[in-house]
A protein has these predicted regions:
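Conserved beta-strand hairpin/beta-sheet module of binuclear metal-dependent hydrolase folds
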Residues: 1-22, 123-142
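Active-site neighborhood of phospho(di)ester-bond hydrolases with catalytic His/Asp-centered motifs
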Residues: 9-12, 27-37, 61-63, 136-141, ...
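Active-site metal-binding motif and surrounding structural segment of the metallo-beta-lactamase
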Residues: 14-62, 157-158
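Short, surface-exposed connector motifs at secondary-structure boundaries
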Residues: 55, 131-134, 192-199
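Catalytic core of the metallo-beta-lactamase
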Residues: 97-155
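Cap/insert and terminal regions of metallo-dependent hydrolase folds
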Residues: 144-231
Length: 235
């Protein structure tokens, strides 16, 4: 998910839909967690923006556990070069920044706030605030007690991008793997005090229409939309 032109939230295969010029502008990546569908594009991004004469490094922000996984299993000199030591260890192109729940990272006119969420591995959601309001991304999560108080505390929540991976018929698998279903999501949405646009993401391929219909049926009073490649959100 590209924020303005310089920040990504997660770096999955979707970055392949960005133009080369778009990739060249990215200098900040916030990772929700270390699962492959959220980091698969990171090596190619680092390779694309690598320049021995760079002015601004590529900084990856994530929980300590996520950064350890990326360093050990991705940029380890075997799967992919360790760009945190290139072109020189004292001045690397790729830098890591630990971002823990409750931390705020300010980049220009935007504040990125990290929220603890409940997935099968340590994970984060993020709120992004600028002068126009607040945009929130849940990351992968199941029902939890941490995301909703943070969202309710936002002054002007305009957009919520939230995952819902499985239809209600697969509730057991969703719970075991740390994901929402339409039923569990809409139950949690009742706790939300704001009325933002709600964009659904992370749906399993082939299940999108059924999941969307189940969410809309369970929450007919909410402004539910389906996120797709190329969608542009304004805050």
């Amino acid at each position: 998910m590209l924020i303005d032109n310089d920040v990504l939230i997660d770096a999955g295969t979707g970055i392949g839909d960005l133009d080369l010029e778009d990739l060249d502008s990215i200098r900040h990546v916030f990772l929700t967690h270390a699962h492959l569908d959220h980091i698969a594009g990171l090596p190619m991004l680092a390779d694309r923006v690598f320049d021995e004469n760079f002015e601004t490094p590529l900084t990856v922000y994530a929980r300590e556990e996520t950064l350890r996984a990326v360093q050990a299993h991705l940029f380890n000199g075997v799967i992919w070069p360790d760009f945190s030591k290139l072109p020189a260890p004292e001045n690397p192109m790729l830098r890591y920044h630990v971002c823990s729940p409750g931390d705020t990272i300010s980049i220009d006119h935007r504040d990125f706030y990290a929220v603890d969420v409940m997935h099968s591995v340590p994970s984060l959601g993020f709120t992004v605030q600028n002068s126009g309001g607040v945009f929130a991304v849940s990351g992968d999560t199941k029902t939890n007690e941490t995301l909703w108080p943070v969202l309710n505390a936002c002054d002007d929540l305009r957009v919520l991008v939230i995952e819902v991976s499985f239809p209600d018929e697969m509730e057991s698998l969703a719970a075991d793997s740390g994901h929402y279903t339409p039923k569990t999501l809409t139950t949690d949405l009742e706790r939300l005090h704001h009325e933002p646009e709600i964009w659904l993401t992370g749906m399993k391929p082939g299940e999108e229409d059924r999941i969307f219909e189940q969410v809309v049926e369970a929450a007919p009073d909410k402004n539910i939309k389906m996120l797709s490649i190329g969608t542009v959100l304004h805050v």
